[in-house]
Amino acid sequence: MNVGIIGNGFVGNAVYQNVRDKVETKIYDVDKNRSLNTFDEVLQQELIFVCVPTPMKADGSCDLSILDKLFEDISNKNLEFLEERTFVIKSTIPIGTTKKLAEKYPLLWIVHNPEFLTARNAVNDLAKADRTVIGGDSTLTSRVAKLYWGYVYYGEDHNIIQCSSDESEAIKYFSNTFLAYKVAYFNKVYDVCEKLGMEYKNVRKGITTDPRIGKTHTQVPGIDKDRGFGGTCFPKDLNSLIHQMESHDINADMLTEVWLYNESIRKVIDWVIT
């Protein structure tokens, strides 16, 4: 087995660092300073991880232009050259995207394998992941599962969830949105404590000792010393899910309120809008 990686940001690098010593691995990025191999060299590998940005548009929707252009470029290659290559999208993408790409490019084998990483600790997060989700045709997802079981987790009793690509895309959005909601909720708890003269650390401890709730995502201010949530993931994923729900006439008021509250308490606007 050998692996190719397209995109050498924190996600692509996490994949690279976790497999490079176990299987032949090649990595390409549009930034030449981040590339160790050419685009064509990466496309010759059996499993090709796609780790490209999917930022937020001004209307909150997900910008798929980089991903779309990438697959257009891949499809223009000699198709025999791509025979039996499996493309593993790790980017966060709207529900239905993998299926649409597979229908548009029927000669390309495409699955979705969302990441659950923090930018600060991505390599270790992948090495110690509590689950791996792989969505798509079961024959293809099994190929990806083989890599994780055989070369990342060494046959450990690692939880690999194989499902449809729609489900894997949804799992990523609902996971991140829940955590964003949790951050906002505990910021509101902090507001109440400040208003009524209570010690937040005591209230927090009393709540988070319950194992059903847990302590993660409850520090206020956060590790970035700011209120609410920011960064590359939670803002864009929450807004994308709101946009997807509204486009299907599903009420998203609860999530919209979370976003409006976050904007009201967040000092640093550190998310990217295209």
Where are these regions (language model features)?
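NAD(P)-dependent Rossmann-like dehydrogenase/reductase catalytic/cofactor-binding core
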Residues: N2, V23-T25, V42, E194-T274
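Internal alpha-helical scaffold of NAD(P)-dependent oxidoreductase catalytic cores
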Residues: A102-N113, T118-T216, Q244-N251, E257, ...
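Rossmann-like NAD(P)(H) cofactor-binding subdomain of soluble oxidoreductases
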Residues: L47, P55-N121
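NAD(P)+-binding Rossmann beta1-loop-alpha1 motif at the extreme N-terminus of oxidoreductases
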Residues: M1-L43, L47
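Structural motif
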Residues: L47-C51, V133
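Gly/Ser/Thr-rich loops at beta-strand to alpha-helix junctions
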Residues: V11, T92-G96, L179
